[in-house]
Amino acid sequence: MADSSAPGRPLRSVCVYCGSSNTTKPEYLDLATRFGQALAARKLRMVYGGGAVGLMGRCAKAAHAAGGDVLGIMPRFLERREITYQDVPHRMVETMHERKHMMFEESDAFVVLPGGIGTLEEAVETLSWRRLDLHAKPVVFLSEDDFWAPFFALMQHTVEANLTPANFNDAVAYTRSIEACFAALEGVSAPM
């Protein structure tokens, strides 16, 4: 597993983990749209799961419509369920493991928008790889409400139980605005 996060390397590509449900809160769909636009405005390539539905579809479509570079990575068995977004380049893979590995390899950083169990699985694996020193890429959770608060409370519980190192928070940021998210990606302190 290559790590493209050498100190001083410019941020060029952001992997976005997020939900594929169209029936979630409109606020989450709106956040995904605005985040995609923000990626394009900053000339950052979006790498994501390749779907045209839910937050992932909204984010990719917004980035693409704003002139951004988008790369989707889709396992063949999910083509019908997540409906591959055909307007952007995409790579087809056979397994979820290949998808996650390729998303990792193609990205300089990770942003986690609201999502379900698949989003959590991707985010936790990325954090686990970071904990194992397999990479030093930024991992930033973003929600404008307290969507991720229960996750971070659980992580703090594991720290207090001596199951997760106390420096866990050094490997991840929890932001509540797009501006704070990009500041965290760039290693700059901004209001959360």
Which residue stretches match the model-derived regions?
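Active-site/ligand-binding-proximal alpha/beta "capping" segment
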Residues: 98-133, 140, 189-192
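Arginine/glycine-rich "motif VI" loop of SF2 helicases in the C-terminal RecA-like domain
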Residues: 64, 130-137, 163-164
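A cross-family phosphate/adenosyl-ligand binding-site feature
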Residues: 2-106, 144-192
